[in-house]
Structures are given as structure tokens and as C-alpha cells.
Amino acid sequence: MSADFPSSTRPENRPPVKNPVQNPVLNPDRTPDQTPPAANPSNTATLLLAHGTPDRLSEMAEYLRNVTGGRPMPEHVITELQQRYTQIGLTDSMPGQGDDGLPLGPPLTRWTLLQARLLQQQLDRQDPAQTESAGQRVYVAMRNWRPSIAEVVAQMKADGVQHARVLCLAPQNSRTSTGLYRRALMAAVGSSFSVDFVSGWADEPLLAQAFAERIWPVWAEACAITGTRVPILFTAHAVPCRTIMTAVPSQPPAHPGTPVPADGMQDYGNLQTPDPYPVECKQTALAIAAALRPVGLTDADWFFAFQSQGIAGAPWIGPTVPDTLKALADSGHKGIVLQPVGFLCDHVEILYDIDIDFKQQAADLGLQLWRAESLNDSPTLIRAIQAALHHPATRLSADPESHPGQATEQPHSRPAHTRA
């Protein structure tokens, strides 16, 4: 393990970035009589789409209705999620702004806006003679919260945007992520402007490099501390089994906790039009592992699982993280390094599910758990986003097919693991 990846300085030790992303919708202090910044001369803009998260605990019920397409959630589910968000710092006070002009509230919002700002600054530094994306304006919209896709699209129309390159900040393509984002976007856009939509970027080399840069120092530290080859566990968010099946009455029952092979889809049902999500998640993990080979990682050193299976009664894809932790402990391992590869920044599925719940489960099994720092403000991630956005000829594809019962998300949380 003699090779090294450059390590980034943590955000709190960095000087604040002075110029926020120029999106009036994101600026609560902007009054209607203020003139918005001029649209890019090319009339082409970049739009980043994210999941969204509530700003305050009291907004949890409204947020969950957005996630489920209007279906109300039981009170005990709302309370459970409020408790989890409380443990990662969310309160009932409206978040203020930091010295850098970004909101101090939920980390998902703050990091997403910072990623957009860094992308904007990267585009502003580039020479228009060298790249067509130089100076393009960057917008951010949230599918399940504010600023909503409809709000931001309205602002883009007012700014004179005629063409948009759009990227979902969930690299792996799925009906319940990319498909829903695209449908919401096109419903808002209508015929107002043209859209190049990046349907998935799980195999972007710079994305794998960004993840590798984050996990390498943690893995090296864990191996040095334990004196053993500590296994790496890559994870991605689970989805309901029905998401990756076609909606036909003759489907056989699916079961959670069953591994999805790297080389294809498991037979979860009548796969006339299989959802690519499980395969793309594994592709990202394979690419990160390949990037780590120069520093000594072998195929025997890493594993893959799906995390944060939901509260819905229907089965979710696996294997689960708890099952994988137990299997590794039963095999004699004393530590594990975990890296979620479907998330680009800190949020509840990382700060609670991994840092609190999984860490305790690992400790109960005699495992020490390390987690790689999230990508957050990784410069390599920002380069990966631009690369994915501006190679549309190899990235665009048709919207994933929508099937009955698959057009809404499920809340991405489940009751805490029961411990003896």
C-alpha cells in the first residue's frame, strides 16, 4: 500500500467560498424588485436535481407526503424519522445562513448547494473557446422539497433558458430515482425549452476516482490499526423488489436479502424491461475497486450490500448491511470499512443509518466500523459531474419505463435494529 491518493481538507478548515450559486429561488432574501442575473449568453443552463430534505422537524409529514406521492404516513413513522433527524442535528428552528451564504440546516441541502456552487465556479473559470459549457449558469432543484423542480423551472423560463443539461445527483439509474426526477422535470418544462437528461452516470471514471480518494486513507488506517486486511463494504440504497420487476399479476414472490450478481439481474420476476439500478450500483463498486488496485486492494477485500431498506411491507432488495456485518463477524473479521457509493454527500442515511445504527450493530458483533468521508465538496466529484453532464452523446437514453405501482418512492427508513 505504498501508493497514495491526495486527501482533501475538511470543510470546516477551509476558507468560505464567497460567491453563492446564482439562483434567486435559493436566496430567501431576494425581493421581487431585484433584477435576477442575466441568463448565459448561450441560453443553455445546467440543472442539478436532488432528493431534498425537510428544513425543520415539523415539516416531516409534508416531506413524506412528497416522497410518497401524496400518501400520508402513519404517525409512528413520522415520529421515528423525526427522532433520527434530531440525532443528526435537525431542529424546529428555521435554519439561518452561514458566512458563506449557504443555509446552516440539513446537511443534504447545504452540501448540494455547495456542490452546485463549486460547479458554477469551475464553469466560470473555463475558457469559452475551449469548452461550450464555460460560464453556463447552474441551477438546483429538489424533487421532494424546496426549491421544487416546478419553482426552479419557472425561474429558468424567466431567465430565458432555451436549453438545459440536467443531471440527477443519484448516479445509478432507477425508476424510483432518475425516472421520477425526469417525469417531474418534463411535466414542469413542457415545451418551454429543450432538455438533455443524463439518465445515469454510474460508470463515470472520475466518480470512481472520487470515491477511491475518500476511502483509501481510511482503509490504510484501519489495516494499520488492526494489523489485518480489513474488508471494505460498499453500499447503495435499497429499493423495493417491485421496482426492478415488471408489473404483471403472475410475478412470483420476491425475497429480501438475496445478493444481486455483478454480471446481471437476479430473477425477481418477469423481467421484460428490467430496472438497471442493482447492476449499476455494482458497476460503481467494481470501478472503485479497480481504482484501488494500485494501492493493494484485491477482489477478496471487498463486499457489497444494500442499506436502509424501507418501512413498506413489501420486500426490498438485498443483501442487507446487518446480514453482511454478521457474516463478516462470523468469518472472524474484527473491523470493516464502509463506503456508501450511491450518495454524493452527508444526509440521514449516512449520518444516522451508518454512523449511529450500523456502527452500534457492528460493535455488538465485535466489529470496529470505519466510514469513508462522504464526497461532499470533493474537487474530483465536481469534475465528475461536469464530465457526466457534457458528454451527452454517450449518456442520454430513454426514460425508464413506468409501470403501475412504481411511480412513487417509499420512505427510505425502517425501525431501528432490535438489540438484545
Q: Locations of the language-model features?
A:
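Active-site-proximal alpha-helix that buttresses catalytic centers in soluble enzyme cores
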Residues: 2-15, 29-420
